[in-house]
Amino acid sequence: MINKIHGKVIEKKESSLVLMTTVFEFELLVSAFCLANFKLSDKVELFTYLYARENELKLFGFLNSDERETFKSLIGVSGIGPRAALRVLSNIRYNDFKEAIDREDVELVSKIKGIGKKMAGKMFLHLQGKLLINNELESSLFGFKELEESIVSMGFDRKIVNSKLKEACDLIEFSNLKDSEKEQFLFKEVLKRMSN
């Protein structure tokens, strides 16, 4: 099984990235959140999942192992195929989806395109208590508490700052930044996201 792919983004499509590795070019179907994180020529590392059926072979790419595990859990739900699972992950971040499932937020989940209340109920039944997040983001935030405090002191809401900081940590998880550069990158990235 292909666990990860390291490569350079040579093409961005509507719902996929084309990566050039040392020898091959791979097209990976990705979530909208994953797609938005990269631009052409970026060097990236994506977790992968190979979906193989008799007449179908598709390679999916993910920001981290948690997003991939959420995808795998979703396709385990009767009636949810890989494209529907990717659509879910394009409409709601995997950690927010886990929270919505755990608290049985029918309204939020059923608003996802192609997921009605009946399918949302099936998801709750199948996934509740089974979506485990590795706390990668939380552990990566541990070293940036001072950064969080400094941004909050600028007058921003702590909850929003924390959320944007988690999003930005998604980016540095697979970046080639040195430790000394990460805080500076996060500071700029969080402020940029706060202003959007």
Curated annotation (Swiss-Prot):
GO cellular component terms, alphabetically, are:
cytoplasm; Holliday junction resolvase complex
Gene Ontology molecular function terms on file:
ATP binding; four-way junction DNA binding; four-way junction helicase activity
Residues annotated as region Domain II? 64-139
Please give the biological process terms from Gene Ontology that the record holds: DNA recombination; DNA repair
Renumbered residue ranges of the record's region Domain III: 139-196
Ranges where the record places region Domain I: 1-63
**Keyword Chaperone found:** no
Principal location class = cytoplasm
Q: Does the keyword tRNA processing apply?
A: no
Could you tell me where this protein is found in the cell? Cytoplasm
SUPFAM superfamilies cross-referenced by the UniProt entry: Nucleic acid-binding proteins, RuvA domain 2-like
- Could you list this entry's UniProt keywords, alphabetically sorted: Cytoplasm, DNA damage, DNA recombination, DNA repair, DNA-binding
Q: Which InterPro entries does the annotation name?
A: DNA_helicase_Holl-junc_RuvA_I (IPR013849), Hlx-hairpin-Hlx_DNA-bd_motif (IPR003583), NA-bd_OB-fold (IPR012340), RuvA (IPR000085), RuvA_2-like (IPR010994)
Q: What does this protein do?
A: The RuvA-RuvB-RuvC complex processes Holliday junction (HJ) DNA during genetic recombination and DNA repair, while the RuvA-RuvB complex plays an important role in the rescue of blocked DNA replication forks via replication fork reversal (RFR). RuvA specifically binds to HJ cruciform DNA, conferring on it an open structure. The RuvB hexamer acts as an ATP-dependent pump, pulling dsDNA into and through the RuvAB complex. HJ branch migration allows RuvC to scan DNA until it finds its consensus sequence, where it cleaves and resolves the cruciform DNA.
Domain comment in the entry: Has three domains with a flexible linker between the domains II and III and assumes an 'L' shape. Domain III is highly mobile and contacts RuvB.
Self-association and partners: Homotetramer. Forms an RuvA(8)-RuvB(12)-Holliday junction (HJ) complex. HJ DNA is sandwiched between 2 RuvA tetramers; dsDNA enters through RuvA and exits via RuvB. An RuvB hexamer assembles on each DNA strand where it exits the tetramer. Each RuvB hexamer is contacted by two RuvA subunits (via domain III) on 2 adjacent RuvB subunits; this complex drives branch migration. In the full resolvosome a probable DNA-RuvA(4)-RuvB(12)-RuvC(2) complex forms which resolves the HJ.
Q: Which family does it belong to?
A: Belongs to the RuvA family.
| Name recorded for this polypeptide | Holliday junction branch migration complex subunit RuvA
